[in-house]
Amino acid sequence: MRVAFALRRSLTRFPVWAIALGLVCGMQSGVAAAETASPTAIQFTLDRPLDASDAPFVLASTRGLFRSENLNVATNIASGPGDAIARVASGSSDLAQVDINALMRFRDKADAAPVKAVFVLFNKAPYAIIARKSRGVRALSDLEGKTLGVADGDFSIWFWPALAHQNGIKLASVKLAKFSPAVREPMLSAGQVDAVNGFSYLTGANLKDRGVPADDLTVLRYADYGCEAYGFALIVNPAFAAGKPEAVKGFLRAVIAGTRLAIKDPARAVDDVLTQMEGGTRDLELARLRAVIGDNILTDEVKRSGIGGIDPARFARSVDQLAEDVKFRAKPVATDIFDDSFLPASSARLIH
C-alpha cells in the first residue's frame, strides 16, 4: 500500500502539513471472506512547524506503522501549544503533541476540559539558555550582570526562577529582554543580548546555521542544572480516549516503533522528514535530530524504565519548580495530568 502525503495551507499564517495515510481495506490472507475492519481516522496536531524532532511521527506514517495498527492519521499544525490543546479539548483534534507543562497551565483553569497526557516523548524538557562565549558566558553563573533574551510566549522561562535559585543566581542580577520569536537568533548573533532562552535543539542549531561559530556557542541545558521538567507529550481528547481506547494504544505503539527507527538510523529518518518540510537542510535537521535523541529522548531514565511514562516523584518535584513562577490554583499531581493506562508494558517500551 502506498503512503501519500498531502500538503495544504491553513487559513492562518501558519502552514499546515497534512500527513494522510491512504489505506485500502482488503481480505485477511488465509481467512475466507473475512474483511479487515475499517481503519480508525485520527486527527493529530503538532504545536509547531514540522522539523526533524518530529521524526517518530513521520516515520510512523512513511514506514507504514500507523497503517499496521489500522489507523488513518491526518496531521495538522497548530499556531502554538495553546491552540493545539484547545483543538484537543474541543474535539477538533483527537491527539496532539504539546509541552506537558503547558498542559498543566491549561488544566489549572476552573473550566478546563479534563485533557490528559498519555505518552511522554521528551523525557527531559529541551529548555536551555544559549549564549556566546565571546560575550563572557560559559557557565550558568556567568549570567549575573548579563542580559538574557526571552521570546514572547516562550514558556520555558517559567522554570528560570527555580533554576536560578537552585544554582545560587540572584534573579535581579540578570536583566530579561523580551522580543518576538522571529528575532531571537538575530539578537544573539548581532550581540544585542548576551544569551537567549529557548529550546536547545532549535535555537542552538539555528544559530550554527546562521553562521555563528560552533565553538563560540554555549548551550546551558536546564536539565543539566537541576531542572526536573518533562517535555513534549501526547495528549488525547477525553471522549476519543473513552470511545476508542484501542486506537489510542495503537497510535502509541506506532510512535514507539517510529522512535526506535529514528534512533537506529537518524540519517535515514531525516531523509523521510525532509520530504515533508519547507526549506529544511539535511545537515541542520540531522544535527537537530541527533541532539534531541541524545539530550531529550534517550535518557538514562528511559534506558532503565522505557519510553513514554513518568515518575510521579519526579513529576511532583517538577511541579514545585514550576510553582516558583506559576501560581497554581491547586498544584497538580501526576494522575491529574497523566494517564498511563494506554501505555504498553514497560518491557515493550524499552529503547537502548
Predicted stretch roles:
Residues M1-T12:
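N-terminal secretory signal peptides that target proteins for export/translocation
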Residues R13-Q28:
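Bacterial N-terminal signal peptides
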Residues M27-T36:
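Signal peptide processing junction and immediate N-terminal pro/mature segment
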Residues E35-A190, D194-Y201, L220-Y222, C227:
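Short, glycine-/small- and polar/acidic-enriched structural segments
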Residues T62, A89-S90, D108-D111, H165-I169, ...:
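Sec-exported extracytoplasmic/periplasmic mature domains
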Residues F315-H352:
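Conserved C-terminal helix/tail region of periplasmic/extracytoplasmic solute-binding proteins
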